[in-house]
Amino acid sequence: MTVHDRIEINSKVMLGKPVIRGTRIPVELIVRKMGEGADEKALLQAYPTLTPQDIHAALRYVADSLGHEEVVLSVAE
């Protein structure tokens, strides 16, 4: 199963935000919680429908999204 098999974007689910397929758990929530210090074990306990593979897919999805994003930096004068 690939990242894209686990991540779903549907305008009728969470206003079209990327979620773990078959859930209403946004990718953003997973990444935000991890950024706040939650580890995989804590996420799996808090969201029993998640699997370790779902968490890894969410992280890869964000990395892929950022990898294809253009960043424009302004030069300080």
Named regions from a protein language model:
Residues E8, E28, E40, E69-E70:
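Acidic-residue sensor for enzyme active/binding pockets
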Residues Q53-E77:
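Short, charged, surface-exposed hinge/linker loops at domain edges
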Residues T2-D5, K33, L50, V71-E77:
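Short, surface-exposed, charge-dense and proline/glycine-enriched linear segments
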Residues M1-M14:
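Basic, low-complexity segments
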Residues L15, V19-I20, R24-Y61:
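Amphipathic, hydrophobic secondary-structure cores in small proteins
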